[in-house]
Design a protein with these regions (language model features):
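Vicinal oxygen chelate
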Residues: 5-13, 52-60, 66, 69, 75-144, ...
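Short, tandemly repeated low-complexity microdomains enriched for cysteine and small residues
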Residues: 32-37, 73-79
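Conserved active-site tyrosine of GNAT-family acetyltransferases
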Residues: 18-23, 102
């Protein structure tokens, strides 16, 4: 079952811009349990740096995606749409079962080889079947 919103992914041109908004202006804190500091987590297939920012009590995070080149999927997204919302991610206590149910209910799973996503670790669903929202589902790790 989908249990909660795990994170919301945003794309920014630099960590400094994301940090300024989320930490300095909103007053949130970096989620040190999920972020390798100071350089952020590196996602090689997408050539992207990733930082997790904890919202309030910490059950939901903002995943800040910073492209490291101009040709990756995240970089192309930034170039085409500018900084902002990239995806929403729900936590699941039965990941593969929930992914199967979502497909049965009409969502379109993004398959391997479709851009920068890695659906083997976390299924993604195409925006065209979800009100224009790229959707990800991850295993519920609890409060981290």
């Amino acid at each position: 079952m989908l249990t909660r919103v795990d994170h919301v992914g945003i794309v920014v041109p630099s960590w400094e811009e994301g940090r300024r908004l989320l930490l300095d202006q909103f007053g949130f804190a970096i989620n040190e349990a999920r972020t390798r500091l100071p350089e952020g987590n590196y996602y090689a297939p997408g050539n992207t740096r990733i930082y997790f920012v904890r919202i309030g009590g910490g059950e939901t995070n903002v995943e800040v995606l910073v492209p490291q080149d101009s040709v990756s999927g995240i970089a192309q997204f930034l170039h085409k749409r500018g900084p902002g919302l990239h995806h929403i991610c729900y936590a699941s206590d039965a990941l593969e079962e929930d992914a199967r149910i979502l497909v049965e209910r009409g969502l379109e799973r993004i398959l391997p080889g479709s851009g920068d996503v890695n659906p083997e670790s976390a299924p993604f669903f195409h925006p065209r079947a979800a009100l224009g929202i790229l959707t990800e589902v991850v295993r519920d790790r609890g409060r981290r």
